[in-house]
């Protein structure tokens, strides 16, 4: 089963799209931004574990990867 939250690879500007079941939640420039977006959609602080693969699928690098995509 695919995790409900997907953090997409960094764009040319370094931002990463964050989606929930194909719905765009917003753009993140840091792991803290991802955390804030998840709080904003109703998750409780204690429910959010950024390294939990059952909750979040990180594409193009994990929560430490925020460098712009090549060619940007």
Question: How would you describe each model-predicted region?
Answer:
Residues 1-21:
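Short aromatic-glycine-(Arg/Gly/Cys) micro-motifs in beta-strand/loop hairpins
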Residues 5-7, 29-30, 69:
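Mixed-charge, polar/low-complexity N-terminal
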Residues 16, 28, 62-64:
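Compositionally biased, intrinsically disordered low-complexity regions
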Residues 21-29:
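A short, exposed loop/beta-hairpin motif centered on an aromatic-Gly-Thr core
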Residues 29-42:
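A short, charged, amphipathic alpha-helix used as a generic interaction element across diverse proteins
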Residues 40-72:
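Mixed-charge, Lys/Arg-enriched low-complexity segments
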């Amino acid at each position: 089963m695919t995790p409900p939250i997907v953090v997409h690879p960094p764009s040319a500007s370094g931002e990463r799209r964050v989606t929930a079941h194909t719905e765009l939640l917003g753009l993140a420039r840091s792991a803290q931004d991802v955390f804030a977006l998840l709080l904003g959609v109703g998750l409780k602080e204690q429910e959010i574990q950024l390294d939990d693969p059952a909750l979040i699928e990180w594409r193009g690098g994990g929560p430490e990867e925020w460098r712009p995509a090549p060619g940007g």
